[in-house]
């Protein structure tokens, strides 16, 4: 028997990115967990079904957070720029996740709060720790949210307690994938997660491409967030024409490996065109870009180019998992960007 759920209220949604569709006092019909249709008048065939009537309340689609890396230290250390912030705040916190009990407590809070937010889908970072990342996936699966979760890879330029051996990092990723397959999650999917180019050697990226091909999983990472970071990538990868080219060199930049890249604040013309050609998704994280003084991503340009752009809370660089707050920051950043261009 089909599982039918009917909501009544003022329904707002979008068929295209340029216009809202509004159905006042309409009916949203879900069949077996998927939207079957939106109706101004309920079809006769559904007349006997129960209706959840929300009166004059708005009914909107659940939101997708394209970049949610950490949580417990959200909104702290905002007097620092990216690289110093990672060393001072992020890495010491992530090292604690070696302790599965600590991870369990932290991830339980994260999953609970995410469920009570406007987000229904998210791309989430774990840490390098395989068991703790599985704990994160367990909590998110129980929440009912639809998520992609990654075990992070780092084999250079990171503290001793967070630096994996190159072979170890690749092998742990394979073992993690086997664990995920064994658990048979319904709503929680794996996503390959090299933290960013400075923390991953060429050898590791080459191995991770083999993992990606073997399991046909998507990729998430960071791109052109900070000017110092970009200069560092130039030193580490002299063969790369631009930051994104370093990922693309190993087949981890869209095309046959669906990819989400966070930030993209300083993407060059060549990088933008490669993202467009390869179908790379941009995770726009306006609050953390402000908090860490990274800059303002040219999102209007990306949309005009036809790139796929979504919002990221980027907790803990952002202060909250609330994507309504991210929307407000995106609007302010967009206004500033346009005014800077005019002047």
Question: How should these model regions be labeled?
Answer:
Residues 1-46, 57-59:
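N-terminal metal-binding scaffold of metallo-dependent hydrolase/deaminase domains
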Residues 9-13, 107-114, 119, 281, ...:
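C-terminal helical cap
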Residues 10, 28, 33, 56, ...:
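Divalent metal-coordination and catalytic microenvironments
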Residues 10-11, 242-245, 249-255, 300-343:
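His/Asp/Glu-enriched, well-ordered alpha-helical/loop segment
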Residues 76, 227-239, 272-275, 293-302, ...:
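Histidine/acidic-residue-rich catalytic or RNA/ligand-binding cores of hydrolases
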Residues 77-145, 169-185:
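Alpha-helical scaffold segments that flank or form the walls of functional sites
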Residues 135-265:
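Metal-coordinating catalytic core of metallo-dependent amide/deamination hydrolases
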């Amino acid at each position: 028997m089909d599982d039918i759920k009917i909501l009544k209220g003022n329904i707002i949604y979008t068929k295209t990115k340029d216009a809202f569709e509004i159905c006042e006092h309409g009916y949203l019909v879900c069949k077996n967990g998927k939207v079957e249709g939106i109706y101004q008048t309920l079809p006769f065939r559904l007349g006997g079904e129960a209706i959840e009537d929300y009166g004059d309340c708005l009914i909107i689609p659940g939101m997708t957070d394209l970049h949610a890396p950490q949580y417990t230290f959200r909104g702290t250390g905002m007097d620092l720029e990216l690289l110093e912030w990672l060393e001072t705040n992020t890495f010491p916190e992530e090292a604690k996740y070696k302790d599965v009990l600590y991870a369990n407590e932290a991830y339980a809070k994260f999953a609970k709060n995410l469920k009570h937010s406007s987000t229904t889908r998210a791309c989430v970072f774990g840490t390098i720790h395989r068991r703790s990342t599985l704990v994160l996936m367990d909590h998110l699966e129980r929440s009912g949210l639809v998520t992609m979760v990654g075990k992070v890879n780092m084999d250079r330029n990171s503290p001793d307690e967070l630096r994996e051996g190159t072979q170890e990092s690749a092998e742990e990723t394979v073992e993690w994938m086997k664990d995920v397959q064994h658990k048979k999650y319904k709503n929680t999917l794996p996503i390959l997660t090299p933290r960013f180019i400075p923390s991953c050697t060429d050898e590791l990226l080459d191995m991770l491409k083999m993992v990606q091909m073997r399991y046909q999983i998507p990729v998430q990472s960071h791109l052109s967030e900070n000017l110092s970071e970009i200069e560092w990538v130039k030193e580490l990868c002299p063969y790369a024409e631009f930051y994104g080219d370093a990922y693309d060199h190993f087949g981890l930049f869209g095309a046959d490996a669906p990819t989400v890249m966070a930030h993209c604040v300083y993407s060059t013309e060549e990088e933008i065109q490669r993202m467009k050609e390869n179908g790379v998704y941009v995770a726009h994280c306006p609050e953390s870009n402000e908090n860490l003084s990274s800059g303002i991503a040219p999102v209007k340009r990306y949309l005009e180019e036809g790139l796929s752009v979504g919002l990221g809370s980027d907790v803990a660089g952002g202060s909250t998992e609330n994507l309504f707050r991210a929307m407000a920051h995106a609007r302010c950043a967009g206004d500033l960007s346009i005014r800077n261009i005019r002047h």
